[in-house]
Amino acid sequence: MAQIDFRKKINWHRRYRSPQGVKTEHEILRIFESDRGRIINSPAIRRLQQKTQVFPLERNAAVRTRLTHSMEVQQVGRYIAKEILSRLKELKLLEAYGLDELTGPFESIVEMSCLMHDIGNPPFGHFGEAAINDWFRQRLYPEDAESQPLTDDRCSVAALRLRDGEEPLNALRRKIRQDLCHFEGNAQGIRLVHTLMRMNLTWAQVGGILKYTRPAWWRGETPETHHYLMKKPGYYLSEEAYIARLRKELNLALYSRFPLTWIMEAADDISYCVADLEDAVEKRIFTVEQLYHHLHEAWGQHEKGSLFSLVVENAWEKSRSNSLSRSTEDQFFMYLRVNTLNKLVPYAAQRFIDNLPAIFAGTFNHALLEDASECSDLLKLYKNVAVKHVFSHPDVEQLELQGYRVISGLLEIYRPLLNLSLSDFTELVEKERVKRFPIETRLFHKLSTRHRLAYVEAVSKLPSDSPEFPLWEYYYRCRLLQDYISGMTDLYAWDEYRRLMAVEQ
């Protein structure tokens, strides 16, 4: 296994800047401070304040949005990073691992990866993802990609339908159809950072948000050695060349992950498990007393001194015995969060250090907090109680169904843009107004300039005389629509759907 040297991983160069010479410790830190500024001031981060964490279209400011959740993940990520660096310092391994002058960048990459980890999520979270994927599957039928005879292919898009005697083109058609039917928030985050917003972040900072390493066009089983890392799509066909360059710059083998991404993932796991339960109490789905009962019942028999006793029971007892006139709810969750972090953060840090050779190589095929330990059991406890008593609550399910309908409806409303022929859509893009297409013209005007420019740039780079051109053009047209709708906030998507469906406000 390769020697651990983080100077080979924390690459401070950028895609759109000429390579620079040796930098001092302070100069490198300034480069990552620039990354922080670009990220924190980006509109993608601001939009998180009106995107769902658990409860869509929530007006209660005490209930978490994607932004407040991401800020909490950022703090936990910083805590884990500092714990790792502190332990490596005690072991006198900072210099040996090339981290003695990179502790600041190490922390900053983790923090900003945490803050950005949800920027690609569509309105209404996972139900928004499902709506996009279901809508495209019902038109592209990726499962028919291996149909025999080819006349059995049910794809409704002529350019992407399989044809006899066109095997090289059919291979591309299969990839495109599979890719478009696997929209995923993490993959969209990569697309946002690189293609749509051109943030030109350092290679190391982008590596921190490449959570999954499976291409969206992947078909079939994933390698056993990487089945966890390839659990979900991590990037699209449109970013394939960029990810190939990223792997080269970060010395990553195929389907391997950047080391600091494991820290971001652990911070997210720790943060949302407690937060979802607290939000459920805030929403009056259950009381603190009922929550404690649910947790106690789900954990089962335990002894004094067990992790459940030290974390959950301790929080419950302290919140009940507090002599100050304070909210029992607030006190319980404060102690529960503190107790949880005090146990899970050191454990995650030690797991990172214990498995550092595989993590540095990018091949550690697990999450830091998914093993046979009590710490892992505690996270599972929080998740299981949330699934059973929060996500299955009628109010939550109704909002999710409404969100699914909104996203499906918006895609259907904008469908005329996908129905235009290549020549007609090209004319609309060039002229921005075509008299014989009044509906399509007005729909096109509603698309954001950023997304339209990304489409134009991608298509302009394609050789127009190539037989692949119609396939790629349609692919980027679909991406244009997915980019626009997935970039909406929950409230904007809701209002836009009602406006375009002529529903009374």
Swiss-Prot record:
InterPro entries in the cross-refs: dGTP_triP_hydro_central_sf, dGTPase, dGTPase-like, dNTPase_1, HD/PDEase_dom, HD_domain
Superkingdom classification of source: Bacteria
Keyword line: Hydrolase, Magnesium
Family matches, as Gene3D superfamilies: Hypothetical protein af1432 (1.10.3210.10), putative deoxyguanosinetriphosphate triphosphohydrolase like domain (1.10.3410.10)
Catalytic activities: dGTP + H2O = 2'-deoxyguanosine + triphosphate + H(+)
EC numbers on record: 3.1.5.1
Gene Ontology process terms (BP): dGTP catabolic process
Pfam families: HD (PF01966)
Keyword Magnesium belongs to the record: yes
Cofactor(s) it depends on: Mg(2+)
GO terms of molecular function: dGTPase activity; magnesium ion binding
Start and end residues of each HD domain: 66-273
Enzyme class name: hydrolase
Subunit (UniProt): Homotetramer.
Function: dGTPase preferentially hydrolyzes dGTP over the other canonical NTPs.
Family from the record: Belongs to the dGTPase family. Type 1 subfamily.
Protein name as annotated: Deoxyguanosinetriphosphate triphosphohydrolase
Source organism: Escherichia coli O127:H6 (strain E2348/69 / EPEC)
Gene name of the encoded protein: dgt
